[in-house]
Every structure is written in structure tokens, then in C-alpha cells.
């Protein structure tokens, strides 16, 4: 048996193999050590010939659904090796084979999957001129592809968040250099990533002559990535994939660009703080699993075209204004369940009888939804109603053939209703009317023998038998055969009982075979409805999301935004959708107005003390814009949203010191990416840029960036720039579309009260020392800090730092270039040369410290 194990293990050496032995799944050798640690099961040893032993750990086969998810979540690939024949029918070693390879990206097990999110497998192909990418969720059948530069593929990887990524063997350095090392990855042989093999695989799967019908024919690199995914499904023994019915192109030009920094800093999907909330958490009132998954997708793919946005808003408004319609849809959605994943299980042959019944219930619930949508005074709802397919024939067949409360597994029996098959009914009559028949035999034999206490019973050793107490054993007929002697009784069998037993047991076996055949035929018939039911699932998910928007709007007092094809962003009394939900009971969120356009107020510089709410104001502006462009109502009194095509944020950078990048380097990298990609329709948020360097460096860089955005000849991006550099307020005097605002505070009796209201004009104070006092800083330190602050302010006034030089900078911005080194001292020249030749981007922290030590030695003359 161990040879059999080793032969099968050699096919997938990197996977943990669950080896079926009777009623247990066993693991051996290093697999056993891994399984014991992850699953918390006992690690033992078994003899392995010639005095050797091998590690072993196992669990009962019925506990697979409990233990398999734990292995997958631990990032393991799991090969399930089952017995391919009944041990009772063979005297040789039981034939075994790998029936499924479950990986983080390839699973249809409900216990592995999260019902609120997709479980995507991705493949990346590094082409000569572009990078191809494909995504597949085998649990839903969604199959998508795209190609483009590395930054676009990086954005897709972060927005789709695949559980596993495939790429060509030997390309790990290229992958991690462009996309990082946070993903679970797997390398495949180079032949998998060839155009000929991929195209052939796709054409064979879709049974087409070309891929033009999918709109991906021109995506050479995307086709290669897509084909690699299908090859991987074969390798993992997932060959029944009839639910993968199309390959769709991810249309980049339809969606707002959100990079990974923006998704993270705006906390769209998850919070950056433990226990914090996200925008998704606030607006997700979906009912169905499909709706929850689609909403998560919408969050990171906002629309940028006016018509589809208004189509969504029209439906949300209809829900909002029609409470009876809303309640009807809500009630029916609660009955539908995970229609999308159930129909996928039909294709792969893993659908249970209970799931088939749930599918029937879902189809029944769709009927009133379809009727209501078709009758609604709303074109978008009418179109949804038209696309919903009642699948009446299969729905009625399920109703006719499957019991309403069947067992979970077909081999438990009792799945098929009475009256479906004559032979099945007859067999059931034989098998399940046994009690009456046995009672008649018992009564007859008792009367014939005169033994009143005679009884007929059954056990697995002797089958049916007659039990007679010792008091009456002299009355037993000679034709009875004694099988067992007990202390107070004897047990006998008769020819009649033996024949009846064979008849009953044969009937039970035949019932199971017949029920399985009838059920399989039904599932095969159901598979013909996969495309129609997938469309149903998509439309139900869409309705669910829009209903969720309406319920959130009603609950939180949101209004419908006005979507306009211009450059004006005019939000009146806007609120932060997440923060307002976290306020203590009775506390009201302080709403604010924000106006940005390309004519008079393109850039707003926001100053104000720490903790005043500058960052919240920036984020709320972006979140309101994003909510509007996914088709949701927004938290404001009114909102005119001039369509945005990109949202950029530079809000808070976490040090990446492990790869040699400081806070400042991260800031500059992110700022550079923004400035190289802005357009006239972009919304740009900068929060406290330049904190990671010296004050004057920070002011200079911040000034230059704001000036660049304002003076850009083509892309006048709408920008909010929050800063503690009050010197930037000088820019309003020299740049006509820059305006100063501040988040107001009030100082009473040497205490600061945060009013959190955006007001016109700059701010002169940061109140940092007041914040330190509020944080519980020792009084002696606060006192000393005030003394130092007064001295510094006095010195600056005397030296004229705050005003004149910056005004001169704005006047001489044409051809000014700073000279960093104007030195004559040879030692300083040597230091200059050392610094200028440093490759800062690739310098690690340890190397930086060593270089600093070298410079120190130069200064000391050593």
C-alpha cells in the first residue's frame, strides 16, 4: 500500500495527500507532520518494513469537510486520493486514484469558500510588449481576461484579490518585482504559456472556431493566460466545467481607475485598523450571496459613463419611492439562496438533493420578481424582468420528482418521490412494508407452536431470526435451524425468513441504484439550463445591489446625486459615510461643503490643526464621488458630480523598511505615480505630503507639486491638498485657481475646541502642543514646548522666513533651479560626491547606516 501511496504522491509532490484507507483519510511522512500541526490531530508512526517506521496522521472520512478548509486556509494544496472500487468486491489491493486536487484558487467546497466573496484563480503571462492576465472563479463560472502594462495588471490583481496566481516557472523574480510577494502563487511549465496550446484549449472548451464572439481575439497575452487556467483545471482533476460558458474582456475604459493605494487608504473593502469599519461594511445590505459578491466588485470598479450610472440610480430611486415594490422584492430575495454556486455544482456533478430543492425554490421566487419588474414604470427594471428565465419545465420536474425535504446525500435514500417510477414504488413496498409482513409471520408461528413470547428480530450477523425463551424450546419445530444460544433463550432461522431477508436486502440495494439513476438523469436535464440560470443569478445579484443602495439611503438619509458630464464637483453638506455611523448616540456629524472645478477653484489647500478633521474631509469627498459613480445615493444635502475618471490618494504611507524604502520614499513613489497619470477628470487627494523629510524640503516639494498640478497644460485635475505647512497659503496670491480653506477650531481658556467646519482662508496655527496636552503628555514637557515654540516664532519673524522668500519663489518659478552644493572645502566636496553617487532607491537600511559611518570617518579625517 505504501508503494501505491508513493506512486500517487509523486504526481503532486508539493501537495498534502489525503489517502483513503477504509473509513479514514490518512497522511504519511512529511504530509503527516504538516497535517498534524495544522489540524491539531495526533501524529503517530506505523511500520514501513525492514524495521523502519513512517509518520502517520489521519481523521474519519466524514470529517473531510471540517479538516479540508483548514489545510486550504493554511495555504496548502491538497490531493484527495479515494478508493476507486469497493473493498468487498476485491481480494487484491484496493485501486486508488486522485479524484481532486483542491488548491486555494480551485475549490467548490462550501466550507472552503466565503459566500460573500469570489474565489478567483488568476494566471499572469509576461509577454514582450504587454502582460496578460485572466481570472476564473470555478465556483461561479466567471471567466475574465485583460492585458496591459504592469501597473494595470497590478491594479487588477489587487481589486480582484485572487486566492492563487499561476505564472511561468522561472519568472518568480519578475512577478514579485512587479506585484510583490503577498499572493499565494504556483509555477507551471513554460509549454502551458504558449499561444498555440492556450488557443487550442479555449477553442476546444467553448466548441468554437475562433474567439471573436467573446471580444478577446486581439488579446494575445490575455488568451495565453486564459488557456493556462484551463490547463491547470485539467491538472487538478477538474474536468467537468460546463458552467464556464464564456470568456469576457475586462473593459478598462468603462471604469474609474483606482490603484491599490486608493482602495486601501479610502478603506473601501477593509479597514486599516483592527476592529475598524469600511465603506463596504456600511453599504452592504444585500440579501443574496450573489449580491454581496457583485457589490464588492462594484466597489472597486466604479463606472465613468453617465448613462449606466443614471440607469442604476433610476432603479435605486424607484425602490426608494415604492415601498410595496421594495418589500415584495426583499421577501422573494430571502428565498433564493446562492443560485450562482448551486448551478455551478450541477455542472461539476457535486450538487446535493437539498441544493436541487433550493434551486427549485429559487426559480419559484424569481417568478413574482420577474412579474413585478416587467410591470414597473422603469426601463432598467423592465430589461431585468425580460432577462429573467423561469425555467418552468425543469422547475416543475424537480417539484414532481424530488421530495421537499430530502436527505443531504443521494445514498441515504428517500430522495425520489413516490409515483415517479413504478419499479421503485414496488421495491419500496417490499422493503418498507416488512414490519407488517414480519408481524403476520410472528403471529402465525406463535399460534402454530403455542409459544406466546416468540418474537422475530434482526441483526447484522444472522439477519432475521426467531427468538424463543428456554422455557418453550421443547415446542420448537424440527425444521427450524438453531443459530445462537443465549443464557435464557435460543435463536433460530427458517427458510421462509431467509428468503424474505434476501428479498428485502435486494430491494434496498435496487432502490439505491434506481434512485441514483433517476437523480442523475434529473441533474443531467438540469445542466441544460445552466446558461439561463446563470443569467438569472446575474440579474438577481444586480437587483440585490440596487435594493441594498435604496435601503442604505433610507436608513442613513442619503440623497440622489446629479451626475454631469463636466468638471464641477459640488457637494453641499457632505458627510463621511463610515465615520457618521461610528459616532456615539446623540452626536451629530459636522457636514461640510466642497466645490472643485477647473475654472475658478481647481485646487483647495486645507490647513488646520492636527485632529481637526482634514483627512476625514478628503476621504469623504472621494467616498461621496465613488458612491455616486457606482450608482448609489450619497450622504449629503445635494451633490453635483462631474464625472471622474481616476481617483488618486496620497493619504498616509506605511514604512516599507524591509526593502529599504522609508516613509518619504513611499510618499515620493506614490506622488510620482499620481503626477504621471493625472487627467482633467481626475480627483486627487494629498494629505500631509512631505512629512518624511526636513521642513524646508517638505515645503519645497509640496509647493512644487501643487504648482505642477495647477500649471499642467492639459490635465487640470481637481485636487484637495491637506497640509500642516501654512506657508503654502501664500500660493493663493499667485495662482488663480488655488484657494485656501481651513478646518476651524476655537480656543477658549487656553483649550482647543475642534469645530470640524471647513471655512474660507488659511490657518496660522497647528495647535500641536494642545493636542499633546490632550494626549496626556507630562505638564513639564508641555510647558517647555510652549517656551520653545514662542522662541522659534520670534526667531522666524526676525529672519522673515514665513513670507517674503515664498512670495519670491512664486514670482520666479519660470527658470529657477536650486543648487544643492556650492562648496569649496575638499572634504565637503568628497562628501558631496559620496552622496551624489548613492543609489537611494536600492539602498537598504543596513547599507545606509554603513555609508553614514563612512561619511562620519571622512569628517573626522580617519
From Swiss-Prot:
One of its GO terms (cellular component) is cytosol. Keywords: ATP-binding, DNA damage, DNA repair, DNA-binding, Nucleotide-binding. SUPFAM superfamilies: DNA repair protein MutS, domain I, DNA repair protein MutS, domain II, DNA repair protein MutS, domain III, P-loop containing nucleoside triphosphate hydrolases. The keyword Kinase does not apply. InterPro entries: DNA_mismatch_repair_MutS, DNA_mismatch_repair_MutS-lik_N, DNA_mismatch_repair_MutS/MSH, DNA_mismatch_repair_MutS_C, DNA_mismatch_repair_MutS_clamp, DNA_mismatch_repair_MutS_core, DNA_mismatch_repair_MutS_N, DNA_mismatch_repair_MutS_sf. GO terms for biological process: mismatch repair. The keyword DNA-binding applies. GO terms for molecular function: ATP binding; ATP-dependent DNA damage sensor activity; damaged DNA binding; mismatched DNA binding. ATP binds at residues 608-615. PROSITE patterns: DNA_MISMATCH_REPAIR_2. It holds the Pfam family MutS_II. This protein is involved in the repair of mismatches in DNA. It is possible that it carries out the mismatch recognition step. This protein has a weak ATPase activity. This is DNA mismatch repair protein MutS. The gene is mutS.
